[in-house]
Amino acid sequence: MDLAVKVKKMGLGHEQGFGAPCLKCKEKCEGFELHFWRKICRNCKCGQEEHDVLLSNEEDRKVGKLFEDTKYTTLIAKLKSDGIPMYKRNVMILTNPVAAKKNVSINTVTYEWAPPVQNQALARHYMQMLPKEKQPVAGSEGAQYRKKQLAKQLPAHDQDPSKCHELSPKEVKEMEQFVKKYKSEALGVGDVKLPREMDAQGPPRIDSPGGDRSTAAAVGAMDGKSAEHRRTQYSCYCCKLSMKEGDPAIYAERAGYDKLWHPACFVCSTCEELLVDMIYFWKNGKLYCGRHYCDSEKPRCAGCDELIFSNEYTQAENQNWHLKHFCCFDCDNILAGEIYVMVDDKPVCKPCYVKNHAVVCQGCHNAIDPEVQRVTYNGFSWHAAAECFLCSCCSKCLLGQKFMPVEGMVFCSVECKKMMS
């Protein structure tokens, strides 16, 4: 790929969703504008998923690329125009007759994603077992939840080097090897089935009492009934509660078909969010979303949100950073060797802190320097100095003294308070 094509590709990435309103900040955001290397809006600092950006095609391309060169190629289709794999997302449309006084109207419900099973009744039952606010009905809170989780759980920059910022050829190669490895060893897609269907597919087995499944019948045909008619109890691998007869369960092939989950329990073991579209990563007996599986394997830069494939990086505030990305969250100046203040877990240089985040002294009405001692009470702050923390009436210094606070003012006595009231 020559330089002109690379620049064009980067430009298109930054044009996507440009100007879209922020669903979180509302009118406070001027519209989405992607930061050059952070995965956030330059105007409001929210992620792209928080903005009203239509990403269905882009998300389908991302998931399609994830399934490329895996056993899940049946879930993708390659476009004839450019050969890019697209996720064949299963959309389910249900029609429910609604009785009226004179005629019957049709109420249509569209799910932006549904488990790819032939039995629509099973898929519908699966959806009903999810919390209502997480059911991906088009135009609903659940559809927005799915959109956010696709962005959060399966970041494009965790699988595609072209979505990362200035990787070296060596880092690109290491990333490609890492992606190939997790596709072959950890990636999977859940199956929705009825537990009794799974028993019918293989020979009956009896597990230990402490396992996920136990049988109430004895081995053999002691009571004259065949093994296939034995009553079997199932428990969820996550919550350990029993599965109800007739309820769908989720199986994960990499975990083994002796384990099963309630639909609402098929969650990442780290963030505990529903695994979006049942896409999971399996490691050491636990389910992970893509993001947290990768976090368990590689350090992630707190600045650009990308995995770190370089041997040289820095650690600060219990987080990892590319050397070039340990920057002020407000102005992007590099912070190596500089004084900084953490604001909402983001490093901010001293000038930006004083300008944008510092609390104002109730005494002198100037910003309080981060290195200066202060007195704070009930949301109000003062410089810890005799000329600032003093009685609002008689100007007596109150450092180390009892005081009476009244709406940002402080008094040394009841008398002074009465004089100012």
Curated annotation (Swiss-Prot):
Pfam families: LIM, PET. GO terms for molecular function: zinc ion binding. GO terms for cellular component: cytoplasm; focal adhesion. Its main location: cytoplasm. Residues 92-199 form the PET domain. SUPFAM superfamilies: Glucocorticoid receptor-like (DNA-binding domain). Keywords: Cell junction, Cytoplasm, LIM domain, Metal-binding, Repeat, Zinc. One of its GO terms (biological process) is negative regulation of cell population proliferation. Signal peptide: none annotated. Residues 155-164 have a biased composition (Basic and acidic residues). It is found in: Cytoplasm; Cell junction, Focal adhesion. Residues 234-297, 299-359, 362-421 form the LIM zinc-binding domain. Interacts via LIM domain 1 with ZYX. Interacts (via LIM domain 3) with ENAH and VASP. Interacts with ALKBH4, talin, actin, alpha-actinin, GRIP1 and PXN. Interacts (via LIM domain 2) with ACTL7A (via N-terminus). Heterodimer with ACTL7A; the heterodimer interacts with ENAH to form a heterotrimer. Belongs to the prickle / espinas / testin family. Scaffold protein that may play a role in cell adhesion, cell spreading and in the reorganization of the actin cytoskeleton. Plays a role in the regulation of cell proliferation. May act as a tumor suppressor. This is Testin. It comes from Rhinolophus ferrumequinum (Greater horseshoe bat). The gene is TES.
